[in-house]
């Protein structure tokens, strides 16, 4: 080859190298530009970037590795296709024709699409045929319906973030998070998990465990063969053939009222066992508690798992509503507290308040009996020379684990040196110990309970100064144990769970409230609660407890319900995907509930309507459960009916109360409001009680240019039932102090409400009014929801008197409600109206003046619980947050029009609180305060008697 040819070849090679280098640089710049400018409407993930890229020109492959933030977003098959398309369009030729592979979070982005949302599933992160065999840990045998497409047989562990812990370095008990916006995370997350998420999962058939105490009952009664709470009694009845004996394993005994660190009460006593029989009631053990105060108590049993233990130990819980039967699989979970359910018990020791364990079984073996616990109780673990001083449900998981018999390394890896980190680790390690030896955790030793996922619900820090939402964040961990869970399943199953929960929340919250809920990132990071569990796990940072815009929603009970239902649905769909099974979503609660007198003598007929869930096509009812309560007792186990109607025969002289749930193959809805009815023995007529009090709400909001927060003193709101969420009253309202967590920082709150259960709407006030009517005279009564009145399905003319409960609901007097009441009055009706917050509605179309015969005189402050006087008596209505009845911070001033007169007044008589109209055409009695909030039963009865006599007497007053 001549010199020129060699030179020319060299030039060509140099040009090719320069051209290749230019292509690489252009590709790199285009990739950097793409990721730097990348935004997604799916989530707020922050700035993305390019980590590196690889080009194989020979194979025509371009591999792109995005920064971690790019993996924080949710991936679907649709947005993955869009990313590839847009990225290719931005690349130079010929690279834009190469096979493109985009990596994030350690995988191709198409592999990050959750299995539930993709056509070709990743089997490495599915359980597939891996499943627990045999009976669940606990089964409610008395449940009157079957669940076949819910979470039946599934065992789920979840927890409500932090609790009070002993801080070793400070030598004091402290919350783990600051007091902000009237709460602290340690209290706040309880109000989502315990009243909403746990029951929804259980209603779907799941066995739910939480490593923190779930029962808000301060009292605790222990009944045991070794030691009993004073007044309680343990009894054994033996068969001629079989006798109770001590087990070789130790059992529970409560030797002390308070316990030091590293002391296990489940090794201080004995446990008892007896061989099983096929015939019922041959031999049994009884635990009869001496209940200190009437109320609801969680019931926990305990036993030891023995080589011959059976999986169907028969427990009977006798409570105020009857008897509920459970089957407990004693082949797992021995040596700890096992939750059966929460029931209502009367004060004292009663033969209808106890737990019985029978030796009846379908299996040959033994049943074991140890202590039974009633109620959550107070914290009893001593740290630094003192107990926490709060109910056990407010303490961290570390202390519950010790009381529950967990080994010391489970709840104190630090050997007592750092309770804070021990508490964080104890949540996961407790679940691992319980599940050790099960199909989902075969590599660890433990109690063989087949838990298959965990979820920790937290709230986060972070704030915005422009009333913008911070929103929800999810956390999971894949970089541990070679990327596998203890069952061998890929840890990316945890990402699937995280993605599905966040996707569900964004969809459900946005749809329910018409607000674009903020979805944040999915972090693949090294957190104890997602690293340590042997099963798929996630942390849900639901919202920011430091941000006012988030907490406006966080304090809203309807929001709490929506969050609970959304997370439940995501868990249902996740586990159904993991096992390849179909699912059905449990229905929504029914509405339009009404009780009418039946066609036959001494019967009542109940009617209601199902509620469609537009978000979930499978959530259709297939039947209903009607629960009954007689008098002051508890609700029974319910009766299944196929249609939305039920007729019940009653005994005159007794008050019957009912609540209804909807059921399908996926489970059971939350209950309806509670309605009541009564048939007098010699009835003079029938009255109708209308429940117009549906409302729940958060506390009063303050949001101006300078001030922001929640004013619990002005109005603590209306919790759903009751809530432990409030720590105290907000002290710092200065918007300029946002981000400061002490001193005068925005949201900083005091501690005066800590440990108190603030009362809200029980949805059971028809019973309160009804009992007053029952005592007032020989009148029968039935009841209905306000929806039935508004829809025209209830004919008011059938009733001698109508009692409308407005409670503290500002929306009671809708247009259709006003029309129905006006029509009733025009036909000679007798109407009682009581409540607060509704006064402004009187001015609409002169309804107050023309129908109720009163005018609105404004609101009267009741923050100091001022006296109300009238009808020869005086009483007070609770104005502030308290534990006995929902607060009424302001009451309505009502003034009579011509022809009517004042019957009640506030304080000195200058502010009218009740009016009476006794015309020739009809009669009304209007109260500017809720009658049910008159707490003294005798006074309330006297007031109702006065009202009934006034409205129904033949003489005109």
For each of these PLM feature ranges, what is it?
Residues 795, 804-902, 907-908:
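A glycine-rich, often tryptophan-bearing local segment used as a flexible ligand/cofactor-contacting loop or short
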Residues 263, 270, 275, 354, ...:
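Active-site-adjacent mobile loop/cap segments within catalytic or ligand-binding domains
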Residues 65-67, 72-174, 369-390, 394, ...:
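Non-catalytic propeptide/linker segments at domain boundaries
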